[in-house]
Each structure stands twice: as C-alpha cells, then as structure tokens.
From Swiss-Prot:
DNA-binding region: 124-222
Function: Member of the two-component regulatory system PhoP/PhoQ involved in adaptation to low Mg(2+) environments and the control of acid resistance genes. In low periplasmic Mg(2+), PhoQ phosphorylates PhoP, resulting in the expression of PhoP-activated genes (PAG) and repression of PhoP-repressed genes (PRG). In high periplasmic Mg(2+), PhoQ dephosphorylates phospho-PhoP, resulting in the repression of PAG and may lead to expression of some PRG. Mediates magnesium influx to the cytosol by activation of MgtA.
InterPro entries: CheY-like_superfamily (IPR011006), OmpR/PhoB-type_DNA-bd (IPR001867), Sig_transdc_resp-reg_receiver (IPR001789), WalR-like (IPR039420), WH-like_DNA-bd_sf (IPR036388)
Keyword Transcription regulation: yes
Assembly information from the UniProt record: Monomer in the inactive, unphosphorylated state and dimer in the active, phosphorylated state.
Name the record gives this protein: Transcriptional regulatory protein PhoP
Effect of loss of the gene: Altered expression of 33 genes; 9 are down-regulated, the rest up-regulated.
Gene: phoP
BP GO annotations: positive regulation of DNA-templated transcription; regulation of DNA-templated transcription
Gene Ontology annotations for the cellular component aspect, listed alphabetically: cytosol; protein-DNA complex
Post-translational modification, as annotated: Phosphorylated by PhoQ.
Lineage, opening ranks: Bacteria, Pseudomonadati, Pseudomonadota, Gammaproteobacteria, Enterobacterales
Length: 223
C-alpha cells in the first residue's frame, strides 16, 4: 500500500513516515499542498493522511479540490479543531475520518488500516488493460492469464507504469518509489531493472509496450 502523508510539521511528518514504513507500506511525505498534488499525480497513493494547517493552502480546501477533481482515495484528516462543528465540516469537505491532536500515532495507524479495509470492498483490486492485468493485492502481473514472475522492484515499476497508462513516468519518480533513502539511489539501476522487465514481458507479449522517452522517462502504452 502507498500512503501519502501531508503534514507541515517536519518532526511529526517524520514519525508518521517511519511508523507507516515499519508497518510495511510505501510512503510519500509532503510538507504543503503543492508537494501533495505532485505525489498524488505522480505516484497515485492508496490513501492520504492530511493535516489541515498547511502553509500554502488550507487542508479543507485541498480536500474539496481533490474531491471536485474526482480523486476518490480514502482521506484521513489530522486536526487540532475539536468542536463538533469542525468535525462536521471536515467530513462534509470529503474526508473519510479524522484524528484530533494531540494523538497517539498508533491511533492514526489503526484508523488508516480501518479505512483501507472499508475501502477494499469498494475499490477494484485489479487493474485490467487486456491482455495485461495487475493484481494489486497479490502484487502479480499477468499477460493473457499467465502470471509473469517478477521481483519486488520489477513489480513496483510495472504497477507504476500501468497505473500511468499512456503517461510518461520520470526516472526520478521511479527511483523515489524504489529507494526512499536518497543515498541508495543509482540511476543505472532503473535501466537494468527496465531491461529485465522488458525481456520478461516480451517472452509473453512480443509487441513493445514500454518505451523510453528520451530526457523524460518511460511510457507504458498498448498499441
């Protein structure tokens, strides 16, 4: 699961990121609405945790804007506003749940997991672009109903490309997903992984579906 944490407090944002990563999830952390918009469009998170007190845009405004643009992912709000009127406003804006500050991170984790369980019955766990199919729960790629054996990194790349079908995904974006720690990133690693992934796909589907867009990144597109 990929989680987007939108929180301007650097220390709290770090603690949330560490806890969520320790639970086995991928995390993108944004300090403001502008950065949150970038991660929303580039990485397509499964759930967002949003603080209302952002420096460049009120969190409620951000949530309303996302919902008006048909962004349907579950949203958990962090807020210091405690009145029932404030809570009604949060939910009316489009949030699915909220946690009031101060809070224990364990409560945030529990509510996040509850939202994902609730949402799993509504959201499709399969991305289907015949003959390609990605099973999000099993983390498997199938071509013509044949499961392709991929490493964890190869699967992450494939899922990202298919989620962005018809759109160029930058190498930097892929690197960030594979290696959250900047010290571990090496640009040639993506080239090696992409080469292996292409070979595995072409063994089942000879037509080229992943192309390199020079100076921009990679594109998955069925022709």
């Amino acid at each position: 699961m990929r989680v987007l944490v939108v929180e301007d407090n650097a220390l709290l944002r770090h603690h949330l990121k560490v806890q969520i990563q320790d639970a086995g999830h991928q995390v993108d952390d944004a300090e403001d609405a502008k950065e949150a918009d970038y991660y929303l469009n580039e990485h397509i998170p499964d759930i967002a945790i949003v603080d209302l007190g952002l420096p460049d845009e009120d969190g409620l405004s951000l949530i309303r804007r996302w919902r008006s643009n048909d962004v349907s992912l579950p949203i958990l709000v962090l807020t210091a506003r405690e009145s029932w009127q404030d809570k009604v406003e949060v939910l009316s804006a489009g949030a699915d749940d909220y946690v009031t500050k101060p809070f224990h991170i364990e409560e945030v984790m529990a509510r996040m997991q509850a939202l994902m369980r609730r949402n799993s019955g509504l959201a499709s766990q399969v991305i289907s672009l015949p003959p390609f199919q990605v099973d999000l729960s099993r983390r498997e790629l199938s071509i013509n109903d044949e499961v392709i054996k991929l490493t964890a990194f190869e699967y992450t790349i494939m899922e990202t490309l298919i989620r962005n079908n018809g759109k160029v995904v930058s190498k930097d974006s892929l690197m960030l997903q594979l290696y959250p720690d900047a010290e571990l990133r090496e640009s040639h690693t993506i080239d090696v992984l992409m080469g292996r992934l292409r070979k595995k796909i072409q063994a089942q589907y000879p037509q080229e579906v992943i192309t390199t867009v020079r100076g921009q990144g990679y594109l998955f597109e069925l022709r």
